[in-house]
Amino acid sequence: MPFVQVTLVQGRTPAQKHTLIAELTKAVSTTLDTPADRVRVAIYEVSADDWGIGGVPYSVARAPQPDGTS
């Protein structure tokens, strides 16, 4: 039974997560020739303050800059 774990920074809508689950299930089922009802998908969401990029929190790394860039 394939088990897929996805970690995302918070902010996706329920509809986006539902689509992700459906598409991952299809891809795994097709690739591994496994019935879709045997595929498990878990989504774990992390806050932007708890995710680091280059030594700084994602919330800081991706914050808009004074010049309008991020």
Spans of features found by a protein language model:
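A domain-level signal for the structural core that forms small-molecule/cofactor-binding pockets
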Residues: 2-70
